[in-house]
């Protein structure tokens, strides 16, 4: 109960600067917008444009990440018998490592480019997730889970940098709307795949591999995009 209150308070406090500083813009009428056709032009021109492929790739690896975050706690309790206290400690540890990773990733983003950061982060998450699958010690699980969290921060920030660079100023609102939608539209997919595979196989380890599969497909799609930066 207390956590919900503090999260709401945190959200309110850090929304105030945006509410104060955001510029007012005129709202266009429906006849001026042609919203659907504008969105279509944004992602499709005789085939999927670069931004369209990126949004699909991002949707898939975001689903994989969502499955890891949502189902990771269930996996930890079911396979490694973590207590509630240990689970909370792991959550705090992974959040701290994600923040550290985001700071480090921001520095290397300027040096290497956003696409390389996303690719390296995906590889880091995939490899650490595979190591988690084959871990039979609670200590190794905690180590690999913390490493996993280290790459979650950079991939989220770098993905936003990529989409902002791909959009011209007048397309920013539509583009980020699609970006947000691509991360939420199929957010159920990862957990459903993990749950279904776990139920069919009778193994949480095998079920968890569905999240890794989504990450790999998203990574392969990224390789199709040239000059992403």
State each model region's role:
Residues 1-9, 196-215:
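A membrane-interface helix-boundary motif in multi-pass transporters
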Residues 133-145:
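Helix-loop junctions at membrane interfaces in 12-TM secondary transporters
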């Amino acid at each position: 109960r207390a956590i919900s209150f503090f999260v709401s308070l945190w959200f309110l406090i850090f929304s105030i600067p945006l509410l104060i500083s955001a510029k007012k813009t005129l709202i266009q009428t429906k006849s001026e917008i042609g919203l659907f056709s504008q969105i279509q032009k944004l992602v499709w021109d005789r085939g999927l444009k670069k931004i369209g492929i990126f949004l699909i790739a991002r949707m898939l690896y975001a689903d994989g990440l969502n499955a890891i975050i949502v189902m990771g706690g269930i996996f930890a309790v079911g396979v490694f018998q973590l207590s509630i206290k240990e689970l909370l400690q792991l959550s705090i540890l992974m959040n701290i490592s994600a923040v550290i990773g985001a700071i480090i990733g921001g520095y290397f983003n300027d040096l290497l480019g956003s696409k390389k950061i996303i690719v390296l982060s995906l590889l880091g998450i995939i490899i650490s997730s595979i190591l988690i699958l084959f871990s039979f010690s609670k200590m190794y699980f905690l180590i690999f889970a913390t490493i996993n969290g280290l790459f979650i921060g950079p991939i989220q920030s770098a993905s936003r940098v990529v989409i902002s660079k791909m959009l011209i100023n007048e397309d920013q609102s539509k583009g980020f709307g699609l970006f947000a939608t691509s991360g939420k539209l199929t957010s159920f997919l990862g957990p459903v795949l993990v749950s279904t595979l776990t139920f069919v196989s009778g193994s949480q380890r095998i079920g968890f591999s569905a999240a890794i599969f989504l990450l790999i497909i998203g990574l392969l799609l990224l390789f199709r995009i040239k000059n992403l930066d």
